[in-house]
């Protein structure tokens, strides 16, 4: 799954549109200052687009692709906004003869400075993934405040065109869209489109907890493999959290999600949930779905959830499918009995359980040994990121095209590859340091 080309094209075009009018403004002016002005405009456009993606409006996935990839673009737009703002501040954008500075102009300059340093702090918190999620989530909402300050800076700062000129109207319109998006995400949750559900049954599935939900009113329509954002305000879990739906769509609109104790949020949720707990559900989201033709599904741990739903929706014309379920031991495998029943009923579904406590960790060689030739096969994966990355590299050696390796990124908050950079620097500087120590005199 990837960001849609139309979304990338729309983003690029939105950034380049100001260049349509800049040539007519540049004449006789400082080119470096004009470049700084352009950087400031692209920063505003990036922030507005980032705010729009954060709304999770249904059209967002249609334009930018599945929500997991849209959020990745959301992150990089934020980083570009910071970089462009920093360069805009560093490169002098002041021009002579633009008019007299007033108190409002001074306030706009101050707003721009506050916005820059605020963004710098918040982006640093975002990429420093060792900072607890709940603290990041609390600070992240202030990015919208700094966008408001940036828009104020743009509207009232002295510039070589007016807000009523075509360029001024364009950037102002983009800012307005971003401000509407920020207002929408800041509004009370009950104003946002969602469906009301009640918990009807809680079932232990190995180490996981299967939560069955019944609709109160109009039910949610979804496809097998999709996920939702769900919150439980009555038990103090009001922050929406993404969960994959672990059952195929039902005619009566009932849903099931399966929770594993993988973090502070899920542990608290498993303790607090009871039957009749009220829930609000937003979605569905995602484009993880049954592929066409022969396919291999690889699940690790609670990563079985989308495949449990997809197995339930599997038709006789689909596949054939080989489902490899990697779990420490069968006793803690969620939905195993259910999957075995489906595999027994459908000749086009083959279930292979790999117990890592006895058979060792799953790797690309083990997958290839189970499935055979991977050319022309689609591989769908759900599970921990390290195993995903290892399989993505290893399966290529067994003939799998990278375009046929499908997964979703459930890391709503991600860094910028600092771990890989540090690993590279460690590998590079270690031998260099050793050589320097040997070459230096005692």
In which residue ranges do the predicted regions lie?
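Intrinsically disordered, low-complexity segments enriched in polar/charged residues with Gly/Pro
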Residues: 31-33, 38, 50, 54-57, ...
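FNR/FR-type flavoprotein reductase catalytic core
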Residues: 5-15, 60, 73-93, 98-187, ...
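Ferredoxin-reductase
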Residues: 190-277, 322, 327-329, 340, ...
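Membrane-interface capping segments at transmembrane-helix boundaries
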Residues: 25-26, 185-195
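Membrane-anchoring hydrophobic segments
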Residues: 1-87
């Amino acid at each position: 799954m990837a960001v849609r080309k139309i979304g990338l094209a729309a983003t690029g075009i939105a950034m380049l549109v100001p260049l349509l009018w800049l040539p007519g403004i540049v004449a006789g002016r400082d080119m470096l200052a004009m470049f700084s002005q352009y950087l400031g405009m692209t920063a505003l456009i990036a922030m507005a687009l980032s705010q729009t993606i954060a709304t999770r409006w249904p059209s967002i996935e249609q334009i930018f692709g599945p929500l997991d990839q849209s959020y990745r673009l959301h992150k990089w737009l934020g980083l570009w906004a910071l970089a462009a703002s920093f360069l805009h501040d560093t490169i002098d954008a002041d021009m002579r003869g633009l008019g007299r500075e007033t108190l409002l102009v001074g306030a706009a300059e101050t707003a721009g400075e506050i916005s820059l340093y605020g963004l710098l702090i918040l982006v640093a918190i975002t990429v420093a993934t060792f900072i607890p999620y709940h603290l990041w989530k609390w600070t992240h909402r202030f990015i919208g405040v700094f966008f408001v300050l940036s828009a104020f800076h743009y509207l009232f700062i002295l510039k070589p065109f007016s807000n009523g000129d075509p360029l001024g109207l364009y950037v102002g319109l983009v800012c307005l869209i971003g401000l509407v998006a920020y207002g929408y995400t800041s509004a009370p949750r009950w104003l946002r489109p969602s469906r009301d559900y009640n918990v009807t049954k809680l079932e232990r599935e190995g180490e996981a907890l299967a939560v069955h939900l019944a609709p109160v009113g109009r039910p949610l329509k979804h496809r097998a493999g999709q996920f939702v954002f769900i919150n439980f305000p009555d038990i103090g879990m009001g922050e929406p959290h993404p969960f994959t739906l672990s059952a195929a769509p039902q005619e009566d609109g009932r849903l099931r999600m399966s929770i594993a104790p993988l973090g502070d949020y899920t542990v608290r949720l498993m303790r607090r949930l009871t039957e009749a707990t009220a829930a609000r559900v937003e979605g569905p989201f995602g484009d993880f779905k049954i592929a066409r033709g022969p396919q291999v599904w690889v699940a690790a741990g609670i990563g079985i959830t989308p495949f449990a739903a997809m197995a339930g929706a599997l038709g006789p014309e689909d596949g054939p499918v080989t489902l490899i379920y990697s779990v420490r031991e069968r006793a803690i495998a969620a939905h195993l009995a259910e999957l075995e029943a489906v595999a027994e009923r459908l000749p086009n579904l083959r279930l292979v359980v790999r117990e890592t406590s006895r058979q060792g960790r799953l790797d690309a060689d083990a997958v290839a040994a189970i499935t055979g030739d991977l050319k022309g096969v689609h591989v769908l994966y759900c599970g921990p990121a390290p195993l995903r990355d290892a399989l993505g590299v290893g399966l290529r050696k067994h003939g799998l095209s990278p375009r046929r390796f499908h997964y979703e990124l459930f890391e709503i908050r991600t860094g910028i590859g600092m771990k890989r950079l540090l690993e590279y620097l460690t590998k590079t500087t270690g031998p260099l340091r050793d050589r320097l120590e040997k070459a230096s005199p005692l």
